[in-house]
């Protein structure tokens, strides 16, 4: 530096600012290079190439002097371009570090030459920038020495460059020498800092009092009430004051790094009185400090190695050993501090939440609290995540703090409160700056009599800028920029801290105190987020993912801490603050890490709440099941009888019966049941989930409640399906009424979550239950609709035909024969089917109906094949049914008549079950949506039948459970069987009715066709034929345009003729003649097209009357 330069031309302030910012960027880049080289996945491929292994060994051995013509380096020839491209970023990062080191050394020399006076209490910003530069330079050179592949990377790149360009890269000689010099970075730096030790020592000595004050124990903090904003109620509105506000929230770890590295680099100063004590005090605080992110510095070991061998430093080495031995005491000190901080910050949060107007006057105390809490958290993290030296009797468990989540939560609460009331702070400090500050500044400036023109301009600009401020700027949303003012103040500190300057800063302490407060106030206007990040940024957890996740899991498992677990996803929003513009390539990896972490935490919280809720629901369902009527007999028996057992002493021991609800009677409030504990855990966890509506993380917004809603939906869906207890192998399923009862009990339990979380459980229920009305849910899993449809169609209806189950119109259910283990009525009575309708809803019942129609279509398809097989005989029967002799002969020629009747019965059974579920659905919907059902009924009755949209109306009515003349679902199912020519179609289906008509008399020869008056049903379900004939005729005629009334009249005529011929048969052969006669009456009664006068015209009513009399006289074995 030329001595002719004036103090303003030296630009010390600007250079310090730029170099500190660039130093952080260089640390970021060298950090990423170190991590990349130590990870096999990201390490440059050239360094692991077997073919280049001899070349790399040669380069490392000869570094930095290498013979480019050496045979070992020939392998690089073919890949020189790839090597230069792959390693250029690494190489030029080291070049930038070398240039940074040179510029920093030049600036430190210039500062020494100018005799700048440093005092943290006088020129805070200048002193801080100076000490930061020293620490940054030291950390950077230590990081360089930790890159294991530095020689191979630099040598390989330079050799490839030389082979390509015919010369060595211009920076390589100096760079190679720097790598050699800084193999032992501390010793080399100590040599270089010999000329600077006077300035460094002066700056560090100004820290002694501050460090002692900030290193007090937690008990001393508590006694001094350093973080209490209500310790003096009379002064609660008085703003927090300090001569140097930034010192109040300056972190101890920062001061500790300054002292350790500063005095160690200038180790000659350690012999000075008072300095050794401060240095030893810093050495006793743990065993490591942070270099950068998760790179730590084991200072006892490193300082010992540095001073070992130096003459006259035996006492200093002894001091290091003594400090290491006393390290265990710091664990208890920090634990006591954290205990105080938890209560103090919680108290502060509660007061500020009630009175946010105190944020302005008490902002300095808030930042102070956040600062020391941040410092304690960082201390704990780095000591928990790095093993203590083996010689010390300390384990990682000694550093673990189970209440860390509480402290993290308190920090996040204060941060969110400051961010929430940002405009309040801006209004307060704008008024402060434009009022008190500018008034006092004018008075202070007037007292300064002699100053240069540059200094005068700077102070005038202060007054002008502050005078132009007003609250209206805040109200209009104007952005403030005070960075120029702060830089001018730093310049002013540099100008007036040089020896011989006029005026000197130390002679104008009023100006210093005022401008320090102005800078502090300005930061709380335009740099609120940056100031918060400075004192409470927890992005360090991004680089300790294992510890971060482990702490979260422990917090989630600890009922006393679970309410604070929301702090962990909130901290993920800090991760992006650690990125640097000097290393943009790390933004995406860190951003992805933050997104995956917040997603993991919120998902785990929601899953834990779901698991607890599932246990609560299970207990509630068990209690609800105790009130079922199926348990009534057992409970009455237990209440009536006294269970007594005799012990060895022949004494009677009474076993007390515990009725349902006994758990609600408490003998003591202190006794907690397992359900109480679960509810308490759920309450705490829900408090965490509902703490915030949204968590912003790297341009994404996460909503914790939505995670809980998603988990509840998944849990509720699985629970509903599991309640059905569908067992495919054993063909079992739970009764619909039981499932519905359990679902309602679970819904009642889940609805209680609204008291804790505000989650819209109605939306959860609607979403899940609506999916359960479909055959598959949104995840592709089977639903209860699919399960019940499969069971009723593939299991139950098959049993109807094979196990002697009968459909009883009188009971409106299917019933069993006596002695059967399976009770069909438990699945088909009115209550069960109404419960099924509630579970499956209109969509699910329609799906069940569609599947039944497909089965009917399958049966009709087989009937069609049988009709075509017997077509000629049926055509003859159709024209000769009134000729007995020919008719009998033709009937004998028919094939598979029993098969036709069996299939008609099957169709009738399916249609009867369809009728039952339609009636159940109609009943349920009339209760749930009476107005809508009345509208549907009115439209069905009054909509014109000739209109083209009539089919749509019928489909709507059928879907609502109402009965239509022609079932549109059946029509749609049978439409696939339609012939191309309608004449052929009409003939085929007409012959089917002829086949059924002539086949009915065959039922009279079977014992199973007997009619049961109690059930109003035939034992073989032959009475269901009436439903199949009417429904199929209506659907087939609707599809092919035929007249169903004509077809049924023809069917009635042929059937009557066939049945009347039974009178000529012998009585002993006709086992159920009267029972079969009743089928004619049933067909007419259920038909919308036929009337009784049509029946009387072809079949004597006297026979029907006698048949009814005859069948009701018989006594049948009762059905269950």
From Swiss-Prot:
Keywords on record: Cell adhesion
Any one GO cellular component localisation term in the record: SCAR complex
InterPro entries from the UniProt entry: Nck-associated_protein-1
Disulfide bonds: none
Pfam families per the UniProt record, alphabetical: Nckap1
Taxonomic superkingdom: Eukaryota
One GO-annotated biological process of the protein: cell morphogenesis
Keyword Transferase annotated: no
Entry coiled-coil feature ranges: none
Assigned protein family: Belongs to the HEM-1/HEM-2 family.
Role description: Involved in regulation of actin and microtubule organization. Involved in cell adhesion.
Subunit and interaction comment: Part of a Scar/WAVE complex containing brk1, scrA, abiA, pirA and napA.
UniProt-recorded name of the protein: Nck-associated protein 1 homolog
Organism: Nematostella vectensis (Starlet sea anemone)
Lineage: Eukaryota, Metazoa, Cnidaria, Anthozoa, Hexacorallia
UniProt gene name: napA
């Amino acid at each position: 530096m030329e001595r002719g330069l004036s103090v303003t031309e030296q630009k010390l302030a600007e250079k310090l600012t730029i170099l500190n910012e660039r130093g952080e960027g260089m640390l970021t880049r060298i950090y990423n290079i170190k991590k990349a080289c130590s990870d096999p996945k990201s390490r440059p491929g050239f360094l692991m190439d077997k073919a280049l292994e001899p070349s790399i060994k040669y380069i490392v051995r000869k570094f930095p002097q290498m013979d480019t013509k050496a045979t070992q380096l020939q392998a690089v020839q073919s890949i020189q371009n790839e090597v230069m491209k792959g390693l250029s970023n690494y190489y030029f990062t080291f070049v930038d570090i070398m240039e940074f080191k040179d510029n920093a050394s030049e600036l430190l020399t210039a500062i020494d030459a100018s005799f700048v006076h440093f005092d943290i209490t006088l020129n805070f910003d200048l002193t801080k920038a100076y000490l930061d530069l020293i620490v940054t330079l030291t950390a950077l050179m230590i990081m360089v020495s930790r890159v294991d592949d530095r020689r191979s990377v630099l040598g390989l790149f330079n050799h490839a460059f030389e082979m390509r360009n015919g010369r060595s890269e211009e920076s390589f000689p100096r760079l190679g020498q720097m790598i050699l010099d800084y193999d032992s970075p501390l010793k080399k730096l100590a040599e270089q800092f010999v000329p600077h030790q006077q300035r460094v020592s002066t700056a560090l000595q100004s820290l002694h009092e501050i460090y002692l004050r900030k290193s007090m124990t937690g008990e001393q903090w508590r006694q001094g009430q350093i973080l209490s904003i209500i310790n003096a109620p009379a002064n609660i509105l008085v703003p927090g004051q300090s001569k140097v506000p930034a010192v109040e929230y300056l972190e101890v770890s920062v001061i500790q790094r300054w002292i350790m590295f500063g005095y160690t680099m200038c180790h000659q100063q350690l012999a000075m009185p008072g300095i050794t004590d401060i240095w030893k005090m810093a050495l006793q605080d743990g065993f490591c400090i942070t270099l950068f992110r998760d790179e730590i510095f084991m200072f006892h070991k490193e300082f010992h190695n540095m001073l070992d061998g130096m003459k006259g430093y035996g006492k200093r080495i002894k001091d290091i050993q003594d400090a290491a031995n006393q390290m265990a005491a710091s664990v208890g000190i920090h634990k006591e501090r954290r205990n105080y901080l938890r209560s103090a910050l919680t108290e502060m949060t509660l007061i500020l939440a009630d009175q946010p107007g105190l944020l302005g006057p008490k902002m300095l105390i808030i930042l102070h609290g956040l600062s020391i809490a941040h410092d304690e958290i960082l201390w704990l993290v780095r000591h928990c995540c790095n093993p203590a030296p083996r010689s010390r009797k300390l384990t990682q468990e000694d550093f673990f703090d189970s209440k860390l989540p509480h402290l993290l939560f308190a920090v996040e609460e204060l941060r969110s409160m400051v961010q929430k009331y940002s405009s309040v702070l801006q209004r307060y400090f704008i008024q402060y700056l434009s009022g008190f500050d500018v008034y006092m500044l004018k008075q202070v400036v007037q007292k300064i009599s002699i100053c240069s023109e540059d200094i005068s301009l700077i102070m005038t600009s202060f007054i002008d800028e502050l005078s132009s401020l007003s609250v209206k700027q805040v109200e209009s949303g104007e952005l403030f920029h005070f960075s120029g003012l702060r830089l001018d103040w730093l310049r002013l500190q540099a100008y007036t801290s040089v020896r011989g300057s006029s005026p000197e800063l130390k002679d104008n302490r009023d100006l210093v105190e005022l401008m320090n407060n102005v800078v502090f106030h300005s930061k709380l206007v335009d740099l609120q987020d940056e100031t918060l990040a400075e004192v409470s940024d927890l992005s360090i957890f991004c680089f300790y993912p294992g510890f971060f996740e482990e702490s979260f899991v422990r917090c989630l498992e600890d009922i006393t801490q679970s309410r604070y677990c929301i702090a962990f996803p909130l901290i993920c929003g800090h991760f992006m603050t650690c990125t640097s513009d000097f290393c943009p390539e790390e933004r995406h990896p860190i951003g992805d890490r933050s997104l995956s972490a917040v997603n993991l935490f919120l998902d785990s919280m929601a899953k834990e709440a779901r698991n607890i809720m599932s246990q609560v629901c299970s207990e509630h369902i068990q209690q609800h099941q105790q009130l079922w009527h199926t348990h009534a007999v057992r409970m009455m028996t237990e209440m009536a009888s006294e269970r007594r057992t005799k012990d060895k002493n022949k004494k009677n021991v009474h076993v007390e019966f515990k009725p349902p609800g006994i758990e609600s009677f408490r003998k003591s409030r202190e006794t907690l049941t397992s359900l109480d504990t679960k509810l308490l855990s759920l309450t705490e966890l829900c408090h965490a989930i509902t703490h915030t509506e949204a968590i912003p993380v790297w341009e994404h917004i996460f909503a914790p409640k939505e995670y809980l809603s998603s988990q509840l939906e998944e849990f509720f869906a699985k629970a509903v399906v599991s309640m059905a207890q569908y067992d495919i192998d054993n063909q079992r399923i739970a009764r619909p009424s039981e499932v519905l009862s359990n679902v309602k009990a679970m819904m009642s339990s889940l609805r209680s979550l609204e008291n804790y979380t505000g989650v819209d459980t109605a939306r959860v229920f609607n979403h899940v239950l609506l999916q359960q009305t479909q055959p598959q849910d949104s995840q592709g899993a089977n639903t209860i609709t699919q399960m019940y449809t499969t069971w009723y169609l593939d299991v139950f209806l098959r049993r109807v035909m094979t196990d002697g189950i009968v459909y009883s119109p009188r009971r409106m259910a299917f019933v069993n024969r006596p002695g059967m283990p399976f009770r069909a009525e438990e699945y088909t009575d009115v209550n069960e089917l109404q419960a099924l309708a509630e579970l499956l809803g209109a969509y699910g019942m329609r799906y069940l109906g569609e599947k039944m129609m497909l089965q009917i279509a399958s049966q009709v398809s087989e009937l069609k094949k049988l009709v075509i097989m017997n077509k000629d005989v049926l055509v003859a029967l159709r024209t000769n049914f009134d000729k007995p002799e020919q008719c009998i002969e033709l009937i004998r020629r028919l094939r598979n008549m029993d098969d036709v009747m069996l299939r008609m019965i099957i169709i009738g059974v399916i249609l009867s079950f369809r009728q039952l579920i339609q009636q159940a659905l109609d009943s349920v919907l009339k209760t749930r949506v009476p107005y809508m059902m009345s509208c549907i009924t009115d439209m069905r009755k009054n909509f014109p039948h000739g209109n083209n949209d009539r089919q749509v109306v019928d489909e709507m009515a059928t879907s609502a459970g109402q009965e239509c003349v022609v079932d549109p679902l059946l029509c749609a199912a049978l439409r696939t069987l339609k012939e191309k020519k309608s004449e052929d179609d009409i003939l085929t289906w007409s012959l089917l009715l002829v086949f059924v008509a002539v086949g009915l008399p065959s039922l009279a020869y079977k014992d199973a066709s007997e009619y049961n008056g109690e059930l109003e049903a035939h034992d073989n379900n032959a009475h269901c034929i009436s439903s199949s004939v009417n429904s199929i005729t209506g659907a087939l005629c609707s599809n092919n345009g035929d007249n169903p009334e004509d077809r049924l009249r023809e069917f009635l005529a042929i059937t009557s003729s066939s049945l009347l011929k039974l009178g000529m048969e012998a009585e002993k052969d006709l086992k159920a003649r009267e029972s079969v006669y009743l089928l004619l009456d049933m067909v007419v009664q259920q038909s919308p097209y036929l009337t009784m006068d049509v029946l009387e015209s072809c079949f004597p009513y006297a026979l029907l009357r006698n048949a009814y009399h005859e069948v009701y006289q018989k006594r049948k074995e009762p059905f269950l």
